[in-house]
Amino acid sequence: GDCGCSGASSCTCASGQCTCSGCGK
């Protein structure tokens, strides 16, 4: 479950949209 975020603590993908919390992009 990676949404293009490096070191993301939480990634949620729904309806083609990805939300990452704690993302260390």
From Swiss-Prot:
Positions annotated to bind Cu(+) 3: 5, 20
Binding site for Cu(+) 5: 11, 18
Binding locations of Cu(+) 6: 13, 18
Sequence positions that bind Cu(+) 2: 5, 23
Keywords: Copper, Metal-binding, Metal-thiolate cluster
Residues annotated as binding Cu(+) 1: 3, 23
One term of GO molecular function: metal ion binding
Residue sites binding Cu(+) 4 per the record: 11, 20
Miscellaneous comment text of the record: The absorption, luminescent, and stereo-optical properties of the copper MT are attributed to the metal-thiolate complex because they are not present in the apoprotein.
Entry function: The metallothioneins are involved in the cellular sequestration of toxic metal ions. Binds six copper (cuprous) ions.
Family membership noted in the UniProt record: Belongs to the metallothionein superfamily. Type 8 family.
Protein name, entry field: Metallothionein
Organism field: Agaricus bisporus
